[in-house]
Amino acid sequence: KDADSLLQQQFPSCHNLLADLIDNNLLLKTKYSFDEENIDSVVFSYQRISDFIIAREIVNKFQDWESFAENINTDKTLHSIFVDKHWSFKGILEAMAILIPERFAHEMTDVIRFIPEDEYERVYYTCLNTISEAQINSLCWRAIESIDKETIIQFLGSKYCHINPDDWYNKLVELSTIPNHSFNADYFHALMMGLTMPKRDSIFQFFFNDCAEYDNDRCANPLRRLIDWAWSEDVSVKADSESTRLAAIILCWLLSSTYIKHRDEATKALVNLLSEQVEVLIETLRQFENVDDMYIYERLYAVAYGVALRTSSRDGLMKLARYVYETIFKRNSPPKNILLRDYARNIVEY
């Protein structure tokens, strides 16, 4: 009745609008349990759109960040979404994680300090889990300029963050090929280069070995999707150079995997991805010149040799050969790794 009355007020000339929207599957008629009573209700068929519209209406009620945050405990709707029934409003929380930074220039996780300690104890695991997941999931959908990188990094290192490390690494792979994103492959590369090889392997080997596959439902994990995309036909011609560069960085780090199947898959994917983008290959080689893992450096030169054999660019091949000669042989102190030297020699001779 309420939905029908509202539509009649807004669109008085459309007498059967509610029925038409339901018939066309834009709205869905359902039963909603409220105070042990089943009530007929109408919801959006497209849940993400519904969540976004609801979140926008809630956020727009407040003039600034202070009024929004301070009402977390006094506004019934906000308290229900963030605390009491947060598990029922994950989609709305995720939409709020997109809207709050754009409207108030604050990350949604800043609301945590407004939750009283007694409330915090009561909802420690569940509430913070839901807010943390919504915050991380929102990064795929947000305007790049609205992301406060330092605030998010501080949150990730705080006691309030309840995110499984593999979930965060999967999210970084999802974001990796987005140009200019705060958490794209350049961020991942800086993170990895800042660690020693033993530390890196202790943190990431399980992720690389487990998350470069399909899950139990045969859905590809983000790293597997990246491999499959890099293997696709004509990808080296169709992909823009910046997305190619970012994808190559992630695949290069997969070369450190102790699982030879994944190293081989990453090697072949890189050859296919870079075969017509030799300048991107050279830039990638430069980025990994100081890597302390010979697994990666050796395989990168295997990739370079594969690209040299496949590329149709004579000019690109000359640039690659010149780079390899100047980097490996010019100073008369080539690396001790015999396979790496052999790949490099074959590139120059070819």
Place the predicted regions along the sequence by residue:
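Solenoid-like repeat scaffolds
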Residues: 71, 77-81, 112-118, 195-197, ...
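Extended amphipathic alpha-helical scaffold segments
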Residues: 235-295, 299
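C-terminal leucine-rich, beta-strand-based interaction scaffolds used for sensing/assembly
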Residues: 3-161, 197, 212-216
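Long alpha-helical HEAT/HEAT-like repeat alpha-solenoid scaffolds in very large eukaryotic proteins
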Residues: 281-350
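Alpha-helical solenoid scaffolds in eukaryotic proteins
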Residues: 74-76, 95, 107-110, 190, ...
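Alpha-solenoid repeat scaffolds
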Residues: 28, 60, 64, 88-89, ...
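HEAT/armadillo-like alpha-solenoid scaffolds in large eukaryotic assembly and transport factors
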Residues: 6, 107-113, 141, 236-239, ...
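Extended alpha-helical scaffold segments
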Residues: 121-256, 265, 308-309, 321-327, ...
